[in-house]
From Swiss-Prot:
Protein name: Kinetochore protein Spc24
Lipid metabolism found in the keyword field: no
Claim: Ribosomal protein is one of the keywords in the record: no
Annotated signal peptide: none
Phosphoserine carried by residues: S11
Region called Interaction with the NDC80-CDCA1 subcomplex, residue ranges: 1-69
Domain of life: Eukaryota
Keywords assigned: Cell cycle, Cell division, Centromere, Chromosome, Coiled coil, Kinetochore, Mitosis, Nucleus, Phosphoprotein
Entry-linked CDD domains: RWD_Spc24
Amino acid sequence: MAAFRDMVEVSNWLLSLLGANRAEAQQRRLLGSYEQMMERLLEMQDGAYRQLRETLAVEEEVAQSLLELKECTRQGDTELQQLEVELQRTSKEDTCVQARLRQLITELQELREMEEELQRQERDVDEDNTVTIPSAVYVAHLYHQISKIQWDYECEPGMIKGIHHGPTVAQPIHLDSAQLSPKFISDYLWSLVDTTWEPEP
């Protein structure tokens, strides 16, 4: 603003000199000074305008950067929310997977226990067969030697069929267990056994 004050003072001085009708040389000198001051003023205005434009450009860049930063922040918040949702979903899936895994482990343990029980039962059966089957075979063979009965194992269910080889003739056996009592059937079969004692030669 000092330049404007200088310009006013020079103008007043110039007017006073013109009014006093001074020498032309002094007037030219003063006019030259006035022109120089005007040029300086114009240069200062140009510099101020240029600086203002630069300041406005910087402010615009800062505003644009601020808008971009806000947009990045908004996108970051959106991505963060999506990640939180995905994390919650993954946590739920992980919980379900862990529950299913625990269930499978329990089922596997039960299967192992069942397998061990089956193996134990199989060993027990093998041990029983080692003792029982030969004994049962011996009893069956002994009963066959005593009763002389040849059984028909392919007859209908509920029917008792076979052939009793007696001392003189072979007699067929045909009994219906649905109509006859077990006691009657047992007594009848034992009645076929020959009670005559014949010592071996």
